[in-house]
């Protein structure tokens, strides 16, 4: 959650990432530029429910599990910045797919500054998805060790039970809905289910 001051207003936003704060600032700027009224803006922003959007937070077996969408280089940079701000030990899972809705071309991965993950205090980095090996290769070029998996649910459950209790799951577009659903199931039943 982010708190910030904007044009004399103190806002306690429910935004979980800087990305959402940027959207808030853009909306405010647009209203101000158009000369539209913004009475109630603060209350609307503070009450806004981001729902199943670009990020969700779960608790699985006492572990904080954050799900984040990253579908292009700029979005991924934002997620890496978010991970770096969290100085606690963590586990990171990166799921990259290449379905039609994701786009078949994953060359954009080479435009992301993954080298910063070396400073993320990650105990484990695991790649998943149809392009898990490509993601692993991308990390290898940055001298970042990683594992790969075809069983995302088992790896999440293992990290939740036996890991740092601080897990980031970063997915591209096609992985968002299924992963969100899977994490919600694990949250209800625990990692043993």
Regions found by a protein language model. Give the residues of each.
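Short, polar loop motifs at secondary-structure junctions
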Residues: 130-133, 152, 173-174
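Adenine nucleotide phosphate-binding catalytic loops in nucleotide-utilizing enzymes
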Residues: 1-73
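Generic beta-sheet signal
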Residues: 64, 90-94, 165-171
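Active-site beta-alpha connecting loops in nucleotide-dependent enzymes
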Residues: 51, 69-148, 189-192
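A short, well-structured beta->alpha microelement
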Residues: 147-159
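Residue-level signal for inorganic ion chemistry
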Residues: 23, 27, 125, 169
């Amino acid at each position: 959650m982010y708190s910030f001051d904007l044009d004399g207003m103190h806002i306690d936003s429910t935004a979980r990432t800087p990305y959402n704060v940027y959207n808030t600032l853009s909306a405010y700027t647009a209203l101000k530029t158009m000369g539209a009224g913004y009475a109630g803006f603060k209350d609307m922003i503070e009450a806004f429910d981001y729902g199943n959007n670009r990020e969700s937070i779960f608790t699985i077996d006492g572990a904080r599990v954050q799900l984040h969408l990253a579908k292009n280089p700029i979005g991924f940079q934002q997620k890496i910045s978010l991970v770096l701000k969290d100085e606690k030990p963590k586990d990171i899972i990166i799921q990259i797919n290449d379905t039609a809705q994701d786009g078949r071309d994953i060359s954009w991965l080479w435009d992301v500054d993954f080298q910063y993950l070396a400073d993320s205090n990650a105990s484990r980095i695991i790649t998943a998805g149809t392009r898990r090996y490509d993601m692993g290769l991308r990390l290898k070029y940055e001298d970042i060790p990683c594992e790969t998996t075809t069983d995302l649910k088992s790896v999440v459950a293992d990290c939740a039970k036996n890991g740092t209790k601080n897990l980031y799951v970063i997915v591209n577009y096609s992985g968002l809905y299924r992963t969100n659903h899977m994490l919600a199931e694990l949250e209800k039943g625990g990692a043993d289910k």
